[in-house]
Every structure is written in C-alpha cells, then in structure tokens.
C-alpha cells in the first residue's frame, strides 16, 4: 500500500514516518510540508539520515491521488477541513489526525476550536476512529481521536458501556507531556517554564471535552457532563489520566478486573494491570499500548481508573496506523509490534 503524509515535519508526522518504516505492507510514496519543500527530512531531523530520503513537497492533490492509496493528514486543527476533501472524493483512504472531523455538531466545533467547521457532508462521512470500538470497520475516512480522549475513553469504556456508574460522577484528571502541545514553541512550553513545574491549563475548556462527551453519550445517553482538567508535566511524551467514578452499586476488585479483562480480551494494545498494580508513563513510552490500572474504595464508593499512553503513538500516529490496518484488513498490530522504550 502506498501512503502520503501531509504535515510530515510535525511531531505526529514524524511518528507516522518512524512507525510506517516498520510496516511490511506499506511504502511511503510522498511527504508534504507547509513549512519546508525540496529538502529531505534529514535536513531538519538528523536522526533520519540515510533512513528517509523522500523530498518534502508542496501539496499537490492530483499527484497525491495518483501516487497514493492512503493519505495521513497530520496538521494542526483548521487545515484538514479544507485539504482532505479531494482525497475523500477520490475514494482514497483518509486518516485525519487533527480534530477537524471528530465532532458531528459543526456548532460545537466552532465553539470549542474557534474556527469555521468542515462541510457537514464530509463530517457525516468521517468515522470516529477509537480503534478498539470502531462502529464501521470498513470506513475509509477516519477522524483519529485526540490523545486525552483516547486515554479517557479507553479508561472508562467498560463501565460506561455496561451502565454500571452514576452518570453524574465522572471526574477526569489528565496530565500530558510537553510534546502534546505540538512542535511550535510558546511561553508556556518554554523549558524554563515547564522544567520542575506542573501547569494546569484550559480548565473546563479543553477541546477534547466535547469529543469525549460525544462518545460517552453514544454508550450512555444519560451522562450529562464530565469534570475534566488537563495539566502539563515536565516529560517529553506521555499521558497520565486518573479517572474517578461512583458505581451505582458496590463492586468488588475482582469484578472490576473481570469486566475490564473481558472487554479488552481481543484488544492487542490495551493491557490491564494486575490487582493493586498501577501503570506508569515509562512502561508505554514510544509504543502503541494503553495500560490501565484499577482500584475500588469501599469506604467512599469510588472507582479509580489510571490510564496511560504515549500521546504521539497511541494518542496519535500509532492509533492512525491501527485504523489503517483495520480498514485494509491487515492484522491490527502490523507495524506496531515493538517493545516500549525503557528506561
């Protein structure tokens, strides 16, 4: 399969390149960048020397359609809504890593992203690509989920889908490494601001909130809202999400683990920790795994779920490739079978 990557010089694009080099059924046909053309990626990223020689090109939709079966769009939000359309119309596989096609309500997108929304007919065509819970596995146009959304939804899905929790009780405390803010630096992501520091940001206003709510209410329409906070922590990669919910009825630790184990029995990239063991960010670094730990406090009647993943892999490029594997009828783990980087 021939693929093109638009946005190849960003962190998400670079991860796509790294991972696709290990995929036996995929060849990279073209690489595209808004910020640089004609040079090779190794000009900007020396770690790719002798590994990726394709030149960076301007976006030429006719050329991409001619040379590719699949297009990955790894650009900031607000770009894919315009540039994805010809590839969808041409019948190519299109996987968008931005938020442009995730929300089915155009007004919600414009409220939370502060940008004009994509045409409604294309939003309707896009399948939300939470890989473990895809509704239409044959879909060829995928809105890849956000990193926080993936960690939260995988962490809470078994309980919500079983309607075992008080729908008003969901509290999510999510923390991200600095790469989650993207490649372009800002005052808040400057080394001197992030090193030995922790910063709460976008309190009650993170753009992944409506995305999470959209999926949760598909599973349980009685959920009215969630309390969701996000923080930056001084690591390069990783999402560490702690979720608190109250069950409708008391539940044992064994019942909790049995539910999660059965839900993810056939999910190659979700690993449920043993009882009283909780995951760390380092155990999933540079991998497509989402590791989940569970606890129940009988005194407070609160379930705590800890969900960790690499925001650039399972939270972005890795899940995008997992979605490609599903749509192409490859093994779901093709190109993604590797051990996390440790320590």
Curated annotation (Swiss-Prot):
One GO BP: L-arginine biosynthetic process
Active site positions: 147
Pfam families: Semialdhyde_dh (PF01118), Semialdhyde_dhC_1 (PF22698)
Enzyme Commission code: 1.2.1.38
Keyword Cytoplasm: yes
Source superkingdom: Bacteria
Transcription regulation listed as a keyword: no
Compartment annotation: Cytoplasm
Catalysed reaction, written as an equation: N-acetyl-L-glutamate 5-semialdehyde + phosphate + NADP(+) = N-acetyl-L-glutamyl 5-phosphate + NADPH + H(+)
InterPro entries: AGPR_AS, AGPR_type-1, NAD(P)-bd_dom_sf, NAGSA_dehydrogenase, Semialdehyde_DH_NAD-bd
Gene Ontology CC annotations of this record: cytoplasm
GO molecular function: N-acetyl-gamma-glutamyl-phosphate reductase activity; NAD binding; NADP+ binding
Alphabetized CDD domains for the sequence: AGPR_1_C, AGPR_1_N
Pathway note: Amino-acid biosynthesis; L-arginine biosynthesis; N(2)-acetyl-L-ornithine from L-glutamate: step 3/4
Keywords assigned by UniProt, alphabetized: Amino-acid biosynthesis, Arginine biosynthesis, Cytoplasm, NADP, Oxidoreductase
Gene3D superfamilies: Dihydrodipicolinate Reductase, domain 2, NAD(P)-binding Rossmann-like Domain
Functional summary from the UniProt entry: Catalyzes the NADPH-dependent reduction of N-acetyl-5-glutamyl phosphate to yield N-acetyl-L-glutamate 5-semialdehyde.
Similarity comment: family membership: Belongs to the NAGSA dehydrogenase family. Type 1 subfamily.
Protein name as annotated: N-acetyl-gamma-glutamyl-phosphate reductase
Species, as recorded: Listeria monocytogenes serotype 4b (strain CLIP80459)
Taxonomic path: Bacteria, Bacillati, Bacillota, Bacilli, Bacillales
């Amino acid at each position: 399969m021939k693929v093109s990557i638009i946005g190849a010089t960003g962190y998400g694009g670079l991860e796509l390149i790294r991972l696709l080099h290990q995929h036996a059924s995929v060849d990279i046909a073209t690489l595209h960048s808004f910020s640089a053309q004609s040079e090779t990626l190794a000009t900007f990223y020396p770690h790719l020397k002798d590994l990726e020689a394709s030149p960076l090109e301007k976006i030429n939709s006719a050329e991409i359609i001619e040379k590719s079966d699949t297009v990955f769009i790894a650009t900031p939000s607000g770009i894919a809504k315009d540039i994805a359309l010809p590839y969808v119309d041409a019948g190519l596989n299109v996987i968008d890593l931005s938020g442009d096609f995730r929300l089915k309500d155009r007004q919600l997108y414009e409220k939370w992203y502060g940008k004009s929304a994509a045409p409604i007919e294309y939003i309707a065509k896009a399948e939300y690509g939470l890989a473990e819970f895809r509704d239409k596995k044959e879909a060829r146009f995928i809105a890849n989920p956000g990193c926080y959304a993936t960690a939260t939804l995988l962490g809470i899905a078994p309980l919500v889908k079983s309607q075992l929790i008080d729908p008003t009780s969901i509290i999510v405390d999510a923390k991200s490494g600095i790469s989650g803010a993207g490649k372009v630096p800002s005052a808040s992501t400057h080394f001197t601001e992030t090193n030995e520091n922790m910063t709460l940001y976008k309190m009650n206003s993170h753009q992944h909130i409506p995305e999470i709510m959209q999926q949760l209410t598909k599973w349980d329409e009685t959920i009215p809202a969630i309390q969701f906070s996000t923080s930056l922590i001084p690591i390069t990669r990783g999402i560490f999400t702690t979720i608190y919910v109250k069950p409708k009825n008391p539940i044992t630790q064994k019942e909790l683990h049995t539910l999660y184990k059965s839900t993810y029995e056939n999910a190659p990239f979700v690993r449920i920790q043993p009882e009283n063991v909780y995951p760390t960010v380092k155990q999933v670094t540079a991998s497509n795994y989402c590791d989940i730990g569970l606890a129940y406090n009988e005194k407070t009647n609160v379930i705590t779920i800890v969900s960790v993943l690499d925001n650039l892999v399972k939270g972005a490029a890795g899940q995008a490739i997992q979605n490609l594997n599903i749509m192409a009828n490859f093994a779901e783990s093709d190109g993604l079978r590797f051990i996390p980087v440790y320590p």
